[in-house]
Swiss-Prot record:
Catalyzed reactions: a lipid X + a UDP-2-N,3-O-bis[(3R)-3-hydroxyacyl]-alpha-D-glucosamine = a lipid A disaccharide + UDP + H(+)
Protein name: Lipid-A-disaccharide synthase
Keyword field contains Transferase: yes
Record family assignment: Belongs to the LpxB family.
GO BP terms, alphabetized: lipid A biosynthetic process
Keyword vocabulary terms for this entry: Glycosyltransferase, Lipid A biosynthesis, Lipid biosynthesis, Lipid metabolism, Transferase
HAMAP family from the UniProt entry: LpxB
Organism per entry: Dechloromonas aromatica (strain RCB)
GO molecular function: lipid-A-disaccharide synthase activity; phospholipid binding
Keyword set includes Cell cycle: no
Cellular component aspect of the GO annotation: membrane
UniProt pathway: Bacterial outer membrane biogenesis; LPS lipid A biosynthesis
Role played: Condensation of UDP-2,3-diacylglucosamine and 2,3-diacylglucosamine-1-phosphate to form lipid A disaccharide, a precursor of lipid A, a phosphorylated glycolipid that anchors the lipopolysaccharide to the outer membrane of the cell.
Amino acid sequence: MGSAVRIAMVAGEASGDLLASHLIAALKTHLPDAVFYGIGGPKMQAQGFDSWWPMEKLSVMGYWDALKHYREIAGIRRQLKKRLLDLKPDIFIGVDAPDFNLGLETNLKAAGVRTIHYVSPSIWAWRGGRVKKIAKAVNRVLALFPMEPALYEKERVPVTYVGHPLADIIPLQTSKQAVREKLSLPRDYPIFAMLPGSRQGELAMMAETFVETAKIIRERHLPNAMFVVPLATRETRLQFELAIYNRQAGDVPFRLLFGHAQDALGAADVSLVASGTATLEAALIKRPMVITYKIAKFSYWLMKRMAYLPYVGLPNVLAGRFVVPEILQDEATPENLAEALVKLYEDKENAEAVEEAFTEIHLQLRQNTAEKAARAVIECLN
């Protein structure tokens, strides 16, 4: 293996950007001269990654959103495929974004480029038949969750269980009072974290519902409640501010943070979280939460028809049971969400049971992920 190893990568959203940035950092300790290029976000770029298109171009949610942006995304994939086939990198790593990456990986593998898919698609939840497509696309899958390797081994797809980097990063115990002090929040007030998502499409669906939920909690249940809202980008912050204006909630004490999701979750008694990686962060910080989500009606209908499991939130999937409530789609009214959040806030016994279940998950996922993943990549290169 020559010294300047060329590693192409594609990440499609914030969670993939985080995973890939840790992997790049770990790979650089083994391969200091390696070059990294493709499509990635700000965290990857901070590690020296050369992103040819903005990652946001690939961040779509649900079938309807994907259809609306199909032409643009297909154009990017076509140009990217041509460029990568011309450059022939030593290895290609698709980070999540299976609908974009698997087809690309299939083409590259057929042309002799080694391919890895980092983050197994949710074949345990729906569309399990994808495992056959994955087998054609990749030389190896890097799986984040402990129930995944067996599904690949059954189909003779090389797989490495690497755990989840958030489990390495987040300490096993987080002091609520220490985080409140850091954020200058009162020690004894009811505090709710609200995580409406990281993408603009999610905010468009969820922001006003979250704001209205906060209003109801203050007006009908806990008049001194406060709400901490971490937002990933300037655009999503503006969307949330607009939702506050639209719902006439200027008097509700929202504390909007740029990023700092873990601080928001750590300071909170209870969290309201839009389904996704943020639910895993909330679980690792071990606070009770309500998981919620709204997507386009057609996308939801399709997913319900194809789903294998009764739950969608990662914490419940990993526990194999409903540890925390899920209030989805038409059920996700501000009244229902407020009632569920207040109920969790008042049930201290349940908070202890939740902490116990989430500690078990944390220990399972804590695997020194970035290093394990880097070693699997190097093994594939050799």
